[in-house]
Amino acid sequence: MLFRCDRKITLPVACALHSCHVSAARLPTTFELELTVEELCKNKAANEFFRLPETKDCRDVFRCDRSGRVGPIRLAAIRCPTQLAFDVDRQVCDWKARVKNCDKLEKPTKVKPLFNTDEPLCPQGQLACGDGVCLPQALFCDGNFDCDDDSDENACSVDEDPNRAPVCDTKQCVLPDCFCSSDGTRIPSNLNPDQTPQMITITFSGAVNVDNVDLYQDIFKDDRKNPNGCQIKGSFFVSHRYTNYSAVQELHRKGHEIGVFSISNRESPDYWTHGTYDDWLTEMAGARLILERYANITDNSIIGVRAPYLRVGGNTQFEMMTDQLFIYDSSITAPLSSVPLWPYTLYFRMPHKCHGNAQNCPSRSHPVWEMVMNELDRRDDPEFDETLPGCHFVSSCTNIRTGEQFQHFLEHNFQRHYRTNRAPLGLHFHAAWLESNKDYKKILSNFIDEKTSQNDVYFVTMLQVIQWMQTPTEITAIRDFQEWKEKCDVKGLPYCSLPNTCNVKSRELRGESFNLFTCMDCPREYPWLLDPTGDGLDLV
């Protein structure tokens, strides 16, 4: 049959390395199909991209669009940008040299377990593999392949996992240990919005060093104070390489929160999405060991995790966090909505869809807080502009190109929170983005000064948000909220004005040398995954 391809782009493809626009230019408009569209689309998900044998360019893929104007199903065509190719296994556009499956037409189909059948196939407490063999229910989605066809690990999303966490039950989920709501928008203790402080969390992710410490000092000046008289605070998720640990020590001394962002900050999304328990343990618990020793953080205050590239590691990540006594994660994003979400605990099921391309959200119950990242609205004029996808890091809001746009962006998103349920407003930055435009830092500073002049707006750390949620306190009493009085007005000099410059090698990194700056004694070797303390342990 002859098929004319609908070239309207209805779903953009995510790029592995950067944001990109999908083009349909020069895609073939007509070609012969050996199968009907219905046959091609049988058993294919709406968001699955595949190739056709009739097309030769590795950039060209298609998906089944069941919302077309003509007929029940149509094919929607997309083309990756120049210099990129489409990886059907990972379902992303990537550099051509990294795509090794241009000859593959579609993502391999995994065998699914037989959860839904007309008649039960297994006795109570057991489920059927794809081949009909019955196994205990507890073996499904536990990270180990138990079925001969591996089907027990192939239906494990938040919506599919047979052992998933239950939906929110507010009678069982009670503060201070547990918080949930059916749609994620409920204010703790059902306070009225006008009696709820508007909390704003400013966070940075990455290395702390000479390139950004001046920026942090400017933003968090000593004289910038919340209405309770305490200096404003931020949260820093620190990666290891290129970090100056004496600078981290000073941030901690000033009362800012330090969290972990991994040791290696490895670029591969799959490494984080499908990482093993040991991968997450060495990366995050190891990063904490490095911070504790070389930034001299000895008060057990490093309790937060953010996954590199926000690639959540599923249940495995949260099992590690539970075992290692991490209190919260801040990697899961919630899609843009008219009313933002409050943070929640993972004892019960997430109150929103697992958002993002190929994300691996936790499906099981975990005693961990999720400091969910509400997407920000990046439209220049929300009243008239068409709907645009939200953004979680401010630096990923690619349409912000001028200081004026940034100013409107901050005010609009503040009002979205302030005028609805006052869920904490997260402003998540990479330092380099703020440095990229001379106006950005000034506009952010002006925004902070303006908001701290209100008696109901507080710039706090992630931990301080949790502390307030555990003991919800109305605005009339918030000035005396003791948990926000710690390190209220820190004065004095840094612990050391001239840190040690330690030039050390790493056997793990092929003998490469690095400079490590610390107020503490120098390590024998550069700390890395198998030797986070740098003691020079024997490597197997």
What is each stretch, according to the model?
Residues 344-409, 413-416:
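Aromatic-lined glycan-binding groove of carbohydrate-active enzymes
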Residues 18-139, 143-157:
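Cysteine-rich, disulfide-bonded extracellular modules and peptides in secreted proteins
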Residues 17-18, 57, 66-68, 84-85, ...:
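Conserved beta-strand elements of beta-rich interaction domains across eukaryotes
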